[in-house]
Curated annotation (Swiss-Prot):
Belongs to the Gfo/Idh/MocA family. It is an enzyme of class 1 (oxidoreductase). This is L-arabinose 1-dehydrogenase (NAD(P)(+)). The active site is at residue 91. Disruption phenotype: Cells lacking this gene do not grow on L-arabinose as a sole carbon source but grow on D-galactose, D-xylose or D-glucose at the same growth rate as the wild-type strain. SUPFAM superfamilies: NAD(P)-binding Rossmann-fold domains. GO terms for biological process: L-arabinose catabolic process; L-arabinose catabolic process to 2-oxoglutarate. Induction: Induced by L-arabinose but not by D-galactose, D-xylose and D-glucose.
Length: 309
């Protein structure tokens, strides 16, 4: 394989067009060669109706980036790995933890890279927050991740089906940040899932966790919020409150704003994917998904009014 990695993208929907394709175009380590999607095409590359057709035709392809919904990701990722391709997974990495474990083992067996991405971990505030918190006495953590589902997921029925996560689809972004910036592991203690009567996944949720020192970590997720999104994490410490806002684009410490670099979540993901391939390594951290899975396993369910379509 040359230094430039030939790449295929599978699932040309909103996230692929808004984030993946521009990031690939800006990353010199990748050359977009082909795409697969049932209902869309990308100009300037070869297009196929599905991954099977792409893999059959593009024998020299080095890697694939999977952007389809999580319910189909396991079958796609397994097919790509068995075809000898490195694989990058949009979040969440799978519909179940078991799927991801099998994929990780398969990648290791085949000597291939598997990268389970968490784009919010690449937000500008995350690493400065992590470094500052590493030496602080943390007292409590409060997460508020709220938005309007009709604005951010219009017509996306898959989010309401089993494996679609519901409000945890954006909420897992917050959990990916929290599990990155906090110095100790989290354990779920209680959860409440608010589920509309006509769907399978929650429209709102509350999680109460604690780290291994007993520090409380509370998360509130709500898809009925608006018109202004609330994507915030507040960490109370002995040296003041560290506050992340705008989904990780802004940071303040003890009331003072911190100057951050430019936003480059998806470009950073592709740069990391290229580096992983070059080193022959994988990066699969399932802790955010495990917290969500624990909430579904352990949480109390409360039915609410039908969502409608």
């Amino acid at each position: 394989m040359s230094d430039q990695v030939s790449l295929g993208v599978v699932g040309i929907g909103k996230i692929a067009r808004d984030q993946h394709l521009p990031a690939i175009d800006a990353e010199p380590g990748f050359k977009l060669t082909a795409c697969a999607s049932r209902h869309a095409e990308v100009t300037g590359v070869r297009n196929y109706r599905d991954l099977r057709a792409l893999l059959a035709a593009e024998r020299e392809l080095d890697a694939v980036s999977l952007c389809a919904p999580p319910q189909v990701r396991y079958a796609q990722a397994r097919a790509a790995l068995e075809a000898g391709k490195h694989v990058m997974l949009e979040k969440p990495p799978g519909a179940t933890l078991g799927e991801v474990a099998v994929l990780e083992a398969l990648a290791r067996e085949r000597g291939l890279t598997l990268f389970a991405t968490w784009h919010s971990r690449c937000a500008s505030a995350v690493e400065p927050a992590r470094e500052w918190l590493a030496t602080r006495a943390i007292r409590a953590v409060q997460v508020r991740w709220k938005e309007d589902v009709r604005r951010w997921h219009p017509g996306q029925q898959w989010i309401w089906e089993p494996g679609g996560l519901g409000v945890f689809d954006p909420g897992i972004n917050a959990l990916s940040i929290v599990t990155r910036i906090l110095p100790r592991e989290l354990v779920l203690r209680e959860a409440t899932l608010i589920v509309p009567s006509d769907v399978q996944t929650p429209i709102a949720a509350e999680l109460d966790c604690a780290d291994t020192d007993g520090v409380p970590v509370r998360a509130e997720f709500d898809w009925r919020h608006g018109p202004v999104e609330q994507w915030e994490i507040a960490v109370d410490t002995a040296d003041g409150v560290l506050a992340i806002s705008r989904g990780g684009a802004q940071l303040s410490i003890a009331g003072e704003p911190v100057e951050l670099g430019p936003e480059r979540e998806y470009p950073a993901l592709y740069a990391h994917f290229h580096a992983l391939i070059a080193r022959g390594e994988s990066d699969v951290d399932v802790r955010p998904l495990r917290l969500v899975a624990d909430a579904f396993l352990f949480g109390r369910r409360v039915q609410t009014d039908a969502f409608g379509r």
